[in-house]
Amino acid sequence: KYTMPKHGLARKLPFNVKECSGAKAIFSLESDENTLKSYPFEFELLVAFELKGKSLVNTMTVINKTSGEMYFSIGAHPGFNCKVGDVIEFEQPETLETERIDSDNLIIDKKFPLIENSRDIVITEDIFKADALILSGIKSKKLRIKGDNEIEFTFGDCPFLGIWAKPGAPYVCLEPWYGVNDGREVKDDISKKRGIQRLDMGGSFEFSWTAEIIK
């Protein structure tokens, strides 16, 4: 039995600086005897940040150093200035439902309509009262936060996108996820967990997001 902290084990662990030059920095986290107590796989996680003009690119690379297959989930949690009335505009029209989590942080077995054939999610005072919006099946690869300022956020092919803020807070977090919370029907076999990622021995997985200042 292994106990995983909320949001995973990497969030609050110290990373080593692997490279730092000019407009790019790479940080490394490697498994050790402490990580193995909550996550029984040997790994290296590389997190790179690079400034390119008006863009910030964040790339995460997971490397399997276990002598066998490895299962994992990973995501990002960048936050951007945003206020009530601002609009999250997708690249193309979307019909989306949101999933929700309950007080135990488990996915509720119900979906809630969000937008229908529309590009826009309007930030309202109560949009996050039931916690994050958990979206899947998105056709767009990017979106924009449109208000007094404008940011274009590219999230690529991630299977889940979380959108969250503390109610009334002057920001919004855009969270590309490769994995998602369990529901009440928890699978004992991690290989069957919804959204789980798998790597063969010696394999690696990479994903990135980009935030570009438009105005």
Give short role names for the model-derived ranges.
Residues 31-33, 51-53, 64-66, 78-82, ...:
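Beta-strand elements of well-folded, non-transmembrane domains
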Residues 40-44, 51-57, 67-71, 169, ...:
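Coil-to-beta-strand transition motifs
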Residues 60, 197-214:
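Short Pro-Gly-centered flexible turn/kink motifs
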Residues 60-66, 165:
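Asparagine-centered strand-capping/turn motif at beta-strand->loop junctions
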Residues 69-71, 79-156:
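Active-site/ligand-binding surface loops and adjacent short beta/alpha elements
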Residues 146-182:
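Glycine-rich active-site loops that engage anionic ligands at enzyme catalytic sites
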Residues 184-191:
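Short, structured beta-strand/loop micro-motifs enriched in basic residues and often containing a Trp
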